[in-house]
C-alpha cells in the first residue's frame, strides 16, 4: 500500500537526480541511435554511388577502345612496318592459308645459301606452275645464275615484312633481302623488295606422295614478278 506521507526535501532532491540521470541516459541512447542511422544512410549512399559509377564505366567501355600499335624497324635497312594486335576475327582461314603459302614461296625463291640451295630450288619448282617453273629453271642455267654468282662465299637472307592477299588469286609480299659474306666479314647490304604473285590451288599435275606431303593443297604460282621498292637510295 502506498505511503501517503509527503516526501521530505531530501527525498525530493534524490528523485530529481534520478530522473535527470534517466533523462541523460535516454538522450545519450537517442543520439547514438541517430548517429547510427546517419552512418547507415551515408554507407548506403556511398554504395549506391559506387554501383552507379561501375555501371557507367561498364556502359562506356565499348565506346572507347585503345588499339596498341608497334612500329618495327629493320636495323640493317631502316624499313618500318606496323605490328598490330592480332584479332582472329580479322582473318579468314583462306586468307591465312594464302599468306602462308605466299610467304613460304617468296622466302624460298629469294634467299640464297650454298648449303641449302638444292632444297630451296626443289621446293620452288614444286610450288610453281609449268610456265613459272620453266622460267625459274632457266634462271639457273644463265651465266649469272645465283650459284655461279655467289658460290659458297655469299648468303642472301630474307625477312618478310608483310603479306597481303588481294583476293582472286593475287597477293603481294614485301620483304628485306640482306646480302652478307658467308664468313661474317664485311658490311651487310640490305634492300627492300615487293613480290607480286598470282597463284592457284590443285593445279592439274601429277605429284608423288612425298611431294603431296610438302604441298598438300596443290598450291602453284602462276605468275611471279619482283620489284625493288621505290624511294630507296
From Swiss-Prot:
<keyword id="KW-0997">Cell inner membrane</keyword>
<keyword id="KW-0812">Transmembrane</keyword>
<keyword id="KW-1003">Cell membrane</keyword>
<dbReference type="InterPro" id="IPR032710">
    <property type="entry name" value="NTF2-like_dom_sf"/>
</dbReference>
<keyword id="KW-0813">Transport</keyword>
<dbReference type="InterPro" id="IPR007430">
    <property type="entry name" value="VirB8"/>
</dbReference>
<dbReference type="InterPro" id="IPR026264">
    <property type="entry name" value="VirB8/PtlE"/>
</dbReference>
<keyword id="KW-1133">Transmembrane helix</keyword>
<dbReference type="GO" id="GO:0005886">
    <property type="term" value="C:plasma membrane"/>
</dbReference>
<comment type="function">
    <text>Component of the type IV secretion system ptl required for secretion of assembled pertussis toxin (PTX) through the outer membrane. Could possess peptidoglycanase activity.</text>
</comment>
<dbReference type="GO" id="GO:0030255">
    <property type="term" value="P:protein secretion by the type IV secretion system"/>
</dbReference>
<dbReference type="Pfam" id="PF04335">
    <property type="entry name" value="VirB8"/>
</dbReference>
<feature type="transmembrane region" description="Helical">
    <location>
        <begin position="42"/>
        <end position="62"/>
    </location>
</feature>
<comment type="similarity">
    <text>Belongs to the virB8 family.</text>
</comment>
<protein>
    <recommendedName>
        <fullName>Type IV secretion system protein PtlE</fullName>
    </recommendedName>
</protein>
<keyword id="KW-0472">Membrane</keyword>
Amino acid at each position: 500500500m502506498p505511503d501517503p506521507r509527503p516526501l521530505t526535501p531530501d527525498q525530493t532532491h534524490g528523485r530529481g537526480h534520478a530522473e535527470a540521470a534517466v533523462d541523460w541516459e535516454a538522450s545519450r541512447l537517442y543520439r547514438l541511435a541517430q548517429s547510427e542511422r546517419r552512418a547507415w544512410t551515408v554507407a548506403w549512399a556511398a554504395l549506391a554511388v559506387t554501383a552507379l559509377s561501375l555501371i557507367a564505366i561498364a556502359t562506356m567501355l565499348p565506346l572507347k577502345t585503345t588499339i596498341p600499335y608497334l612500329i618495327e624497324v629493320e636495323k640493317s635497312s631502316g624499313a618500318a612496318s606496323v605490328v598490330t594486335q592480332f584479332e582472329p576475327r580479322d582473318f579468314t582461314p583462306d586468307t591465312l592459308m594464302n599468306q602462308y603459302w605466299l610467304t613460304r614461296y617468296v622466302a624460298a625463291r629469294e634467299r640464297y645459301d650454298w648449303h641449302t640451295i638444292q632444297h630451296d630450288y626443289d621446293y620452288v619448282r614444286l610450288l610453281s606452275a609449268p610456265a613459272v617453273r620453266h622460267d625459274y629453271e632457266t634462271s639457273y642455267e644463265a651465266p649469272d645464275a645465283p650459284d655461279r654468282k655467289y658460290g659458297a662465299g655469299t648468303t642472301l637472307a630474307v625477312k618478310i615484312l608483310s603479306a597481303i592477299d588481294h583476293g582472286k588469286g593475287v597477293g603481294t609480299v614485301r620483304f628485306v633481302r640482306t646480302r652478307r659474306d658467308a664468313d661474317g666479314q664485311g658490311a651487310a647490304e640490305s634492300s627492300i623488295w615487293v613480290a607480286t604473285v598470282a597463284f592457284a590451288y590443285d593445279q592439274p599435275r601429277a605429284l608423288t606422295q612425298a611431294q603431296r606431303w610438302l604441298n598438300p593443297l596443290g598450291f602453284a604460282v602462276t605468275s611471279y614478278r619482283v620489284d625493288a621498292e621505290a624511294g630507296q637510295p
